[in-house]
Swiss-Prot record:
It comes from Rattus norvegicus (Rat). GO terms for biological process: carbohydrate metabolic process; carbohydrate phosphorylation; fructose catabolic process to hydroxyacetone phosphate and glyceraldehyde-3-phosphate; glycerol catabolic process; negative regulation of MDA-5 signaling pathway; regulation of innate immune response. Gene3D superfamilies: 1.25.40.340, Dihydroxyacetone kinase, domain 1 (3.40.50.10440), Dihydroxyacetone kinase, domain 2 (3.30.1180.20). Belongs to the dihydroxyacetone kinase (DAK) family. This is Triokinase/FMN cyclase. GO terms for molecular function: ATP binding; FAD-AMP lyase (cyclizing) activity; glycerone kinase activity; metal ion binding; triokinase activity. DhaK and DhaL domains have differential roles, individually DhaK is inactive and DhaL displays cyclase but not kinase activity. Residues 372-571 form the DhaL domain. Its EC number is 2.7.1.28, 2.7.1.29, 4.6.1.15.
Length: 578
């Protein structure tokens, strides 16, 4: 069965994709009758060398994304994973020659079809008296024994686009550019790894990988790599890649060693998330620096893809200062990243954390009866939430991402860890403030933020008094802050429903002669009833608000958790009173 693709037709997808890119970029034009994109300011290139590249489609943004001042003059696109037609290549050469350029350099990836078709077009152009040269890029570092076809052309080709473009922009001649980039290309190595295959529109995937497997050294068309291995953490993957790329017994290795200076490219092969790319980039830089390699520049993104392949390639290019200047030279090519002209290695990547405001000594005093009671309450709350983890997760799966219990359990374990550090502060306001900071840092998600808001606001009325009216006022203040920023209201099927119900009962604490436990008992029962009632509500806030009410037939997990917290508090205070 072929994979799903968003195309108009299999036959027309390459042309449609190129047309869409040109339509969105006024600096580009299509060459009438051909699948060719060119700079729209060709006339400004009179007397300068033109640079043409291309190949099969399906590797976007390569190569059209790298057309622009300081990079390519134009590209010729073949069908998906197919070499461009000789006629299209020749038409592109003629177009730039007729614009008055001082010769054309063809930058070609090392694949048989590309070499043949670009080579034939070059010979025909030369026969017409046009000055044309060709460089073939072979940067694949996968194969330890050189094959007759040579090394494949991979993402390192993009760096040659950049270097050649900068040289052409300086006004260097065709012969000299050709010689320089031919030498530079020999100091580039690329290696890929993937978790999945890719599939040409209208066809089945190019190969199969088990769920726990990945393939090392595969090509950008799904060609076989050097071996399959079990899925391991990113640090191990990157270590394996760097070891393979720099192993001197590997005929296709890149000669990077301690003391070398490199440009690093972390290239998404199509289907990785930016989250994964960031993790891989972090590992690559750490591990290179750990080997004594200076990372002069780092590029992270999608440069040469393989359709939807869930993989990454790493490219290393040995550089010196003159070569870095060419990498840093200005370009307006849409797919080239805007990089700082500063070395990655040697830069201080950590800024000192801001200092905490000084606390009044009386606010931080610990120990005493109140402190011990607060410790018992917090310990019971923590134990309760940890015990409810699976139940809350199950409730959350119907309307959220199924992690409400895990989130509350994470908060509970953080509180337990804090309690082990020593006695809690004697001041309830200080306890709530510290809990707020702890939950914001450790709990995470919207729940952490909402509890953080609630506790921060609730702490304020308790700074002056800690009697029952002050605790009722603290509840009111916390709810007000939660509503202000969370945008939830009673009846929206959130934790606020339980908290609001409890708060209404706690208003009785503001009356003269009010008792602690009778009022709190009513508050707990109201909170539990409100939590149970949420299963009949339509969600008005949070992720559940995007779910049909017909699917919401269980209580809201946040409301259940809030009610359980009140029940835990009551149980501790009842035990103390007994």
């Amino acid at each position: 069965m072929s994979s799903k693709k968003m195309v108009n037709s299999v036959e027309g997808c390459a042309g449609d994709a190129l047309a869409g890119f040109v339509a969105c970029n006024p600096d580009l034009q299509l060459l009438q009758g051909y699948r060719v994109a060119l700079r729209s300011d060709l006339d400004s290139l009179k007397g300068r060398v033109a640079l043409l590249s291309g190949g099969g489609s399906g590797h976007e943004p390569a190569h059209a994304g790298f057309i622009g001042k300081g990079m390519l003059t134009g590209v010729i696109a073949g069908a998906v994973f197919a070499s461009p037609a000789v006629g299209s290549i020749l038409a592109a050469i003629r177009a730039v020659a007729q614009a008055g350029t001082a010769g054309t350099l063809l930058i070609v990836k090392n694949y048989t079809g590309d070499r043949l078709n670009f080579g034939l077009a070059m010979e025909q152009a030369k026969a017409e008296g046009i000055s044309v040269e060709m460089v073939v890029i072979e940067d694949d570092s996968a194969f330890t024994v050189l094959k007759k076809a040579g090394r494949r052309g991979l993402c390192g080709t993009i760096l040659i686009h950049k270097v050649a473009g900068a040289l052409a922009e300086e006004g260097m001649g065709l012969e000299e550019i050709t010689k320089k980039v031919s030498v530079i290309a020999k100091a580039i190595g690329t290696l890929g790894v993937s978790l999945s295959p890719c599939s040409v529109p209208g066809t089945k995937p190019t190969f199969e990988l088990a769920a726990d497997e990945m393939e090392l050294g595969l090509g950008i068309h799904g060609e076989a790599g050097v071996r399959r291995i079990k899925l391991v953490p990113v640090d191990q993957i990157v270590t394996l890649m760097l070891d393979h790329m720099t192993d001197t017994s590997n005929i296709s290795h890149v000669p990077v060693k301690s003391g070398s200076s490199v440009v690093l490219m972390v290239n998404n092969l199509g289907g990785l998330s930016f989250l994964e790319l960031g993790i891989i980039a972090d590992a690559a830089i750490r591990l290179l620096e750990g080997r004594g390699v200076k990372v002069a520049r780092a590029l992270v993104g999608t440069f040469m893809s393989a359709l939807e392949m869930r993989g990454v390639s790493l490219t290393l290019m040995l550089v010196d200062e003159p070569l870095l200047k060419l990498i840093d030279a200005e370009t307006n090519a849409k797919a080239w990243p805007h990089m700082s002209k500063v070395s990655v290695t040697g830069r201080n990547r950590i800024r000192a954390a801001p200092t905490e405001p000084a606390e009044a000594p009386e606010a931080t005093a610990a120990g005493g009866v109140a402190s011990k009671q607060m410790t018992l309450v917090l310990d019971r709350i923590s134990t309760t939430l940890i015990g409810l983890e699976e139940h809350l997760n199950a409730l959350d799966r119907a309307a959220g991402d199924g992690d409400c219990g895990s989130t509350h359990s994470r908060a509970a374990k953080a509180i337990q860890g804090w309690l082990k550090e020593g006695p809690t502060p004697a001041s309830p306001a200080q306890v709530l403030s510290k809990l707020s900071v702890l939950l914001l840092e450790k709990m995470g998600g919207s729940s952490g933020a909402l509890y953080g808001l609630f506790l921060t606001a609730a702490a304020q009325p308790l700074k002056a008094n800690t009697d029952l009216p002050a605790w009722s006022a603290a509840m009111d203040a916390g709810l007000k802050a939660m509503q202000k920023y969370g945008k939830a209201a009673p009846g929206d099927r959130t934790m606020l429903d339980s908290l609001w119900a409890a708060a209404q009962e706690l208003q009785a604490w503001k009356s003269p002669g009010a008792s602690l436990l009778p009022v709190l008992t009513k508050a707990v029962k109201s909170a539990e009833a409100a939590a149970e009632a949420t299963k009949n509500m339509e969600a008005g806030a949070g992720r559940a608000s995007y779910i049909s009410s017909a699917q919401l037939d269980q209580p809201d997990p946040g409301a259940v958790a809030a009610a359980a917290i009140f029940r835990a508090i009551l149980e501790v205070l009842q035990t103390k009173a007994a």
